[in-house]
Structures are given as structure tokens and as C-alpha cells.
Amino acid sequence: MWFQLRAPYIRRWEAEHERPFFYAGAAKGADVALWLQAAHLEHAALAQQAAAATLVDLVKAFERVSHIGLLTAAKKWDYPMWALRLSLAAYRLGRRVSTQGVLSAIVVACRGITAGSAFATTELRLLLLAALDHIHAAFPMLPLYVYVDDMFLAATGAPKHVCRILTSATKQLVMLLQAAELEVSDTKSEGVASSPWLCLQLGKALAIHGITFSLSCKSLGGDVAATLKRSVSVQKRRLRDLRARRPRIARLRKAAVGTARLFRTGFTAALTWGAHVVGVATTPLMQWRREAARGCAAAAAGKSPDVVLLLADEGPAHTTDPAFAAHALPIGYWARLCGTRGGHARTWLLTCAAPGSASPRPRA
């Protein structure tokens, strides 16, 4: 309750130190960041330019935060010290390690903030602010998107130019993160490029950091590709995971659990995450609808998914059928982000539509 009562002071500090590359806020969620990431890469492909991006991820970002580094950053950026004092006092509470009934002496942690606490995301942003400001100022032409601890840095243009500038920016970013006592993951950090040659060159240049490049990759839980060929590997994996849950869903249905509600509130949202970027093809959409119908009806095999999913809706506002989201999301996001009141993509759209550049358009 103490944290919640004082949250407005922290929100005010966030507003005073807002940056265009920071996401995870009002109307700037992961879905918006993912859409814009894919839009930049796709526009470069439509304009027949080389494109590449690095996705830098941190190892245990919250657990590796140095309390001394956090204090130094708080003094630099005028963060409310009384709020930081309470946070650090909570993080540094004495604790014991227990294993097989044996307790250790009291241990006091000198690094780490609790993920999920009221101010944890803001404190991580506070620690990253100086490094990200430096990259944004040194490479203003490179789109930068930061969602909590996921950093996306892209470059477009001639192949050699892309290779040179993206390598330099990524190396500087990694160096600055390491200076802040944060560790860059060499297993989760990856890159995407528009050609095999660019993948090879960037992979060699950034091999020291363990960043490998491919024509498509996963970013913020969705598929991203640097070519005009759509990537749906994450989408296919989620469909396989849903099929693997058939026995569990059947047991829930036998226990009189409203499985249709589970599909409306959970399964469909998980399956269609990223559909606003790559859409859903006819065949996988039909497979999704059949799995949803099977989960909602006791014996849906051989029945029409249209009828089963229609009957599963308990009201006019319910949309158990995943076809609703699959059709509405791509069009809805394009209209919302690029419309006159959309906001975040408006400037980007006008820049892309300037003379000499290819006009961006959604995927067919």
C-alpha cells in the first residue's frame, strides 16, 4: 500500500524523463513496439533496401541490477531518493538459504531488484537511461525500441553501410550495458537481416557477443522478418502447444469448467499474439478454429466449426472463434497506428511516404 500511495510521484518522474524509444506505457505496449519493428523492416524490403536489426537481451536483468549503480543513476537523473531508499531497504532485507533442512547464516543481497514490485520496471529504466540516451544521440538515424530489458536496434540502406553502422551501434550498446554491470545474453540475443550475405557478415562482426543472424527471428513474442517472405515459426509452435493440451482441456470440460471462456480470455489471445504483424493464413486459421471447436464441444469431430463456435458464444459481445481476431487485428492496428488520431506511427508513415521512398502498406 505504501508503494501504491506514492506511485504518482514515480509516474511524474517517468513523464519528465520520457523517451521516444521507451515502450511499456500508456498506448505503447509490446504489441505496438512489435508492429513498428516489423514495419521498419518491411518498408526497407519494399523499398529494395538492405535491412538488419539486433535484438539485445539481458541475463536476469532484474537480478543483476547493482544497488550502487542504481544509486549513482538516481543522483544523476534526480530520481526521488526517498522512494529509492525504501526500495533498497526492501531489497536488502536479510534472508537465509535453506537446503535439505539446513539453514545458512543471514545473507544480505547487494544487487538485484524484485521483478513485479511497484517500481522495479522504473528502476531498471533508470539504470538503462544513460546508455540508451548515448546510443540514441550517437545514432539518431537508427530506430531504437526498448521494452523493459529487450532492446531492438535496426538499420537500413546499402548492405555495407548497414553492416558497418549496425555493428558499431550494437558494440557500443553492449559496452555501455556492461559498464552498468549488466550482462548481455549470448543465447537470447540475436539478429535478423535481409540477405544471407548480410547475415554472414554481421554474424562474424558480432560473434564475440554471441549474436547470430538469420532471415527471421522472434521479437517480443512475435515473428519478425527482414524480407518480404512471412515468417510464422512462432505461430506454428503455439498451434502445436495447443494441440498438446487437448487432454488437459478435455479433463476441464468433463469437470464442468467453461472451456469456451478459457478460449475467449486466454487461448485465443495467446494464439493470435503477433497476428497483427504477420496475419494468419487460411490453413493455420482453420486448424486453430478446429482446435477451439474441439475444446468447446464434447464431441466436435466431424462437426462444423462454424456452428460449434457460434453456439459457444454466450452473448453478442463474445468472440470464441479465433477468426474474429485473425481478421480484425491486422486491419485494426494499421488503422489505429497510422490513422489521423493513431499517434505513434504517424510520423514514421509520413517519413516513409516522402518522395523517393516506397509507400508502406500492410501485408496482403
Model-derived segments and spans:
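Nucleic-acid-interacting cores, centered on viral/eukaryotic replication and modification enzymes
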Residues: 1-364
